[in-house]
Amino acid sequence: MLEIGGAASRSLTESQSSFGPTLAVEVTPIEKWLELEIGVTPLFRPHSTEWSVDLLFKKPWTLSDTKEVMIGIGPEWIYSNAYGIKMNSVAGEIVPDFMFWSSKKHRFGWYLEPSYEYKFGPGHEHSIGISGGLLIGIP
């Protein structure tokens, strides 16, 4: 499955917000037990750019033929450039994921994914975010 959408993040440590697009691919190695999602998100704010790549391990639950909910956790690599200072850091992320499909064939739908992130790098930044957008099922 392919996820294409937008993302917003708010640093709880620095009290600043960032916005940008997001793209992720999700596969199901163990039906009804495990889904893996790898995604990339560039976030922008004045004088700062942050690129993140995450790998989430998700447990899915089917609520109906057209609704699913998942909880995921995983590592994240972050490259940031703020005021010319470049930095790499590692973070941990936890996300609930809500999916709504247009039909039970799961070809097209939309998703909403709130998140909490903790950076293990300098400053130990905490942030909350939300992403949402279009789901495209890949047969």
Mark where each language-model region is.
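Short glycine/proline- and aromatic-enriched beta-strand/turn motifs that initiate or cap beta-hairpins
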Residues: 1-45, 127, 135-139
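Transmembrane beta-barrel strands of outer-membrane/channel proteins
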Residues: 2-10, 38-42, 55, 71-77, ...
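Ser/Thr- (and often Asn-) enriched beta-sheet segments in non-cytosolic proteins
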Residues: 3, 24, 86-88, 117-119, ...
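Small-side-chain structural scaffolding
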Residues: 5, 20, 72, 89-91, ...
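Predominantly the C-terminal beta-signal and adjacent terminal strand-loop region
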Residues: 15, 33, 94-139
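Gram-negative (and chloroplast) outer-membrane scaffold detector with strong preference
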Residues: 24-104, 108
